[in-house]
Amino acid sequence: MLSSSPTSFTHPFLSSSPPLSPISPPSRTARISPPLVSASCSYTYTEDSPRLHQIPRRLTTVPASLYDVLEVPLGATSQDIKSAYRRLARICHPDVAGTDRTSSSSADEFMKIHAAYCTLSDPEKRSVYDRRMLRRSRPLTVGTSGLGSYVGRNWETDQCW
């Protein structure tokens, strides 16, 4: 319960009288010196081997098509595709690429080449791929009337009003 009588606090932190004497920190006679740190660095540079310059430049960027990956024209024969694959495999295969290049980059490049070869060497997969490429390259034409002019949904038709 609370009382209305005045209360006196005897705790030194809560009393209104100043402390008797300030406490000074103990003096230290020993001095600690910071540790000495030294560092050195070396760098060596070696010229790229000529083998690196044989890698097709198209593989360093994103190729436009699988034909670009294999560096063959659109109407290439199956023999052209096979010879292009073998030529690129001799350069980019991780077992042949050597230690000059990182194994992950040569493996990635070879996987792209192999995927392109698998698609383009199979006649069914190649025809499906060619149809998709043709569909992507043609712009969508919109008619002025009739059912053929429906181009799909847009923001206004997707709204539920």
UniProtKB/Swiss-Prot annotation:
Lineage, highest ranks first: Eukaryota, Viridiplantae, Streptophyta, Embryophyta, Tracheophyta
Residue span, J domain: 65-133
Similarity comment: family membership: Belongs to the DnaJ family. C/III subfamily.
Subcellular location: Plastid, Chloroplast stroma
Transit peptide: 1-36
Primary subcellular site in the record, as a coarse category: plastid
CDD domains: DnaJ
Identification of the protein by name: Chaperone protein dnaJ 11, chloroplastic
GO CC annotations, alphabetized: chloroplast; chloroplast stroma; nucleus; plastid
Coiled-coil annotated spans: none
Species for this entry: Arabidopsis thaliana (Mouse-ear cress)
Superkingdom of the organism of origin: Eukaryota
